[in-house]
């Protein structure tokens, strides 16, 4: 997905993202909440290194959460993350927003 335009420390350009919102939210709003994925791992506490996927390599930036209108963007499904990994990422997100 193309993340432009951005400002400051925000990531931009064409890159993979991980959808962290629930299916029903996505379906009824035509929106999705996503976290960016980068190709390197800087071992930051809010980064999660992907381990169980084949096509997408890198780290999920849990601090870079965005809501996107996926109908207005040129998106394509690549692969599904294992439930255990998604649960770990959700735990990091919950820690960031202190739920």
Report the location of each language-model feature.
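Conserved functional hotspots at enzyme active or ligand-binding sites that engage polyanionic ligands
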Residues: 1-99
